[in-house]
């Protein structure tokens, strides 16, 4: 008869300080298929180490171990996991059930790693539990079951993938006498069905029930009774369970099950999961809120600047602001305005002549800023009218004594009058008819309290100031033309006309660009602060996951014992970290929506928009945080030695 398990000259040594301790010495053993074997020995005799080597949980330091003719030393970690998953079933003294899973889910765990389908897996688990007398307790948690019932769940788990070889470590050690008898009867029945059953015990009464007893002492086999009866070699009904599903379906199924297991693990520690998410929620909400609220603030600033007049260029006499050289003060004249208006890139032109004068109506006398402008001035600066109409070309040509006032002036001169068009006021000493009132512009910079009025520039020059030159000329560039290139061309034009460069310009687009750059810089700074909070949240996730790995070390050992590969363990903990971060990210985005609504409630002029790219980036960021900060705990879990993990309390 071909041997199922063969050990030749097995030695297992451990480093203990500076000394090397031999736990197993020159162990040679052959176990045939269908045998019921008991390995008996006192505590420290090496029997548990021998069982770990037989179950491929550990490797010998020397010697050869073959399973069905295959040298175990030639197998990598994944192949060893496959061997445990497909051929071995473990029954532990302390049951080693996962506390957050039901009895049925505990039994299903080995089949999850074998890639068995969900429905087939569930039917098989229920069938095994029913066969072992637990059909009415499939949904019970381990803490709702007695010791004997928990051990039967452990037996069902060992049989889930076939359990060609059943390794039972002190299976009756934690049970009462009645439960012990039941468990031993089940193990004998499994041997009769064709399973190879190996029991490790220190109890001679338990060992005596086996057909073959092997005594071990101080790491050496002292006695081997040999098999009393011819072993049953008929194939067990549950031996072969090779899933027929294609590999990609197995991968999808494993990922789905890992996701479910991650969710169950998170649900088992709701408070800790919520506190872990809190850092991610705050971080994501901060980043998204700063992006969208910052963008709303930026758009409001730019809108205010555009209201002043975008795509416009102001031309001033002299070299720069504050230049009071008399030779350049009169540089800008009417002919310059006409020459500029003829340029192809110019949409509108308006000269400006300014001064401070007294305004009077009845017995009210106030100081105001008076500006002489052309009919195109109001279009250049995008100014709307509250009442009446702006200055017209006809009024400019005939030096009309007309005036346009702002709302501040209306409130001061006409405090009890709503319609003021047609009223006559004194501008300086000149009577002027009010033809329009400029509408007030809402601005985040606040309201301007100064009084301003506008008259035709021809009226200002000839009737009020008595001069023919302008203080400045403002031009509006046509859409589609580069403001910078237009600025260079008009400077070149006026320099040629004047024979020298006696003017300077101020491009409003440069103010717009400066404001945009400044707001972007501030937004970037605030975003970096928010990202720091997100990183802190990620570190919190890593910290909690490392704690979780430590707390769940025995669970990791159980999963490895039933066939989980290192990659399966790593995948599960990575998925848990990513799931925490994704849910935290979703809640963070929801919080940022609430923040946006509150901002709009208190600041109605702000338009909060959540672009899809920002939301996608937030979810991507959550995923990356989960992967980056979940990798170290996941790797730590995957690198655990199953023997050490199972021994951890």
Swiss-Prot record:
Q: Which Gene3D superfamilies match?
A: P-loop containing nucleotide triphosphate hydrolases
Q: PROSITE patterns of this UniProt entry? A: ABC_TRANSPORTER_1, ABC_TRANSPORTER_2, MACB
Subcellular location(s) of the protein: Cell inner membrane
Topology in membrane:
Multi-pass membrane protein
Keyword Transmembrane helix on entry: yes
The catalytic activity of this protein is classed by the Enzyme Commission as 7.6.2.-
Task: Tell me the ranges covered by the ABC transporter domain, including all copies.
Answer: 5-243
Classify the source by domain of life.
Answer: Bacteria
Q: Which InterPro entries match?
A: AAA+_ATPase, ABC3_permease_C, ABC_transporter-like_ATP-bd, ABC_transporter-like_CS, MacB-like_ATP-bd, MacB_PCD, Macrolide_Exporter_MacB, P-loop_NTPase
| GO BP terms | response to antibiotic
Residues crossing the lipid bilayer are 274-294, 420-440, 524-544, 578-598, 608-628
GO MF terms on file?
ATP binding; ATP hydrolysis activity; transmembrane transporter activity
Kindly state which keywords UniProt assigns to this record, in alphabetical order: Antibiotic resistance, ATP-binding, Cell inner membrane, Cell membrane, Membrane, Nucleotide-binding, Translocase, Transmembrane, Transmembrane helix, Transport
Please name the SMART domains in this protein's record.
Answer: AAA (SM00382)
A GO CC term? plasma membrane
Q: Which residues form a coiled coil?
A: none
UniProt: ATP binding residues: 41-48
Under the heading CDD domains, the entry gives: ABC_MJ0796_LolCDE_FtsE
* Transferase is among the record's keywords: no
Cite the Pfam families for this sequence: ABC_tran, FtsX, MacB_PCD
What this chain does, per the entry, is described as: Part of the tripartite efflux system MacAB-TolC. MacB is a non-canonical ABC transporter that contains transmembrane domains (TMD), which form a pore in the inner membrane, and an ATP-binding domain (NBD), which is responsible for energy generation. Confers resistance against macrolides.
Complex and partners: Homodimer. Part of the tripartite efflux system MacAB-TolC, which is composed of an inner membrane transporter, MacB, a periplasmic membrane fusion protein, MacA, and an outer membrane component, TolC. The complex forms a large protein conduit and can translocate molecules across both the inner and outer membranes. Interacts with MacA.
Similarity comment text for this entry:
Belongs to the ABC transporter superfamily. Macrolide exporter (TC 3.A.1.122) family.
Q: Know the name of this protein?
A: Macrolide export ATP-binding/permease protein MacB 1
Please spell out the taxonomic lineage of the organism that makes this protein.
Bacteria, Pseudomonadati, Pseudomonadota, Gammaproteobacteria, Enterobacterales
